[in-house]
Regions:
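Surface-exposed strand-loop-strand hairpins of Gram-negative outer-membrane beta-barrel proteins
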Residues: 1-21, 166
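Flexible, solvent-exposed coil segments and beta strand-coil junctions
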Residues: 3-10, 87-97, 150-158, 203-206
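Extracellular loop and loop/strand-boundary signature of outer-membrane beta-barrel proteins
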Residues: 12-15, 97-103, 155-164, 205-214
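Outer-membrane beta-barrel domain signature
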Residues: 12-13, 25-26, 44-51, 55-57, ...
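Residues that define the transmembrane beta-barrel architecture of outer-membrane proteins
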Residues: 21-25, 105-111, 136, 165-171, ...
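Gram-negative (and chloroplast) outer-membrane scaffold detector with strong preference
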Residues: 28-153, 225
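Extended, basic/helix-rich recognition subdomains
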Residues: 119, 132-137, 147-153, 157, ...
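Predominantly the C-terminal beta-signal and adjacent terminal strand-loop region
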Residues: 176-227
Length: 227
């Protein structure tokens, strides 16, 4: 099945503390062990949205009680195409519930620890450069952590489930360029990629119901901060 993230572009919400977690936003804080290495913890508030207007192949077996709204999907599926585009109104019995709606729009919430290295290249490129005023650095790092999504899902007509739950783990690597001003303020651009394994995603209020998924991700990040 296809899914995508939910970019918001350049928006004032990124500068509004009351709304900055609505778009995809990252937060990180850390400590420099020495001039080159630092360790940090952070939250990558990425989003994952299942493409509802699609046909996907389904394999498995559904056997719900006839009284359940989702019993219309009872049967055996062997790579069977299912149309996920169903407009559902719970007050209209003529519209059946969708087979599945699924998204992590309140965040994939990759909570991770990173170890990074930073090297000053401005003094090497420009011999007379005053790095006390503006310092240009390259940075790279590795990270790992857990996934704490607030998954919004509705499966086979069951009640919607939308709660935070530890659902898996992730690993990541990054590389970027850092510009530090007067040794205290910086702007940093990064490319960050990684792998996410989610083997315990809650899909209904019943703890026995769960889903699994894994995927690769790539982020383009612009960060402002202080030292």
């Amino acid at each position: 099945a296809e899914a995508r993230d939910k970019p918001k572009g350049y928006h004032i919400d990124y500068a509004n503390p009351a709304r900055m977690t609505i778009p995809q936003t990252n937060f990180r804080m850390g400590y420099f062990i020495n001039d080159h290495y630092n360790i940090s913890i952070g939250l990558d508030h990425m989003k994952y949205v299942f493409k509802q207007n699609q046909i996907a192949n389904v394999s498995g077996y559904v056997n719900l009680p006839a009284s359940d709204a989702g019993s219309i999907y009872n049967g055996t599926y062997d790579n069977t195409p299912i149309d996920f585009f169903i407009i559902f109104n719970p007050d209209n019995d003529n519209n059946p519930p969708p087979f599945l709606t699924f998204e992590h729009t309140d965040g994939l919430n990759y909570i991770n620890t990173e170890i990074s290295r930073m090297d000053d290249i401005s003094s090497k490129l420009f011999k007379s450069w005053n790095s006390d005023k503006i310092q240009i650095n390259v940075t790279e790092g590795l990270g790992a952590g857990i996934l704490l999504p607030k998954t919004n899902t509705r499966l086979l007509g069951k009640d919607r489930y939308d709660e935070f739950h530890v659902s898996g783990y992730g690993i990541s690597a990054k590389a970027g360029l850092n510009i530090t001003f007067f040794k205290h303020f910086f702007i940093q651009t990064e490319l960050k990629g990684g792998y996410i394994e989610m083997n315990n995603i809650r899909t209904t209020e019943n703890k026995a119901d769960k889903a699994e998924q894994n995927f690769w991700f790539l982020q383009r990040i612009i960060t402002v901060g202080g030292i």
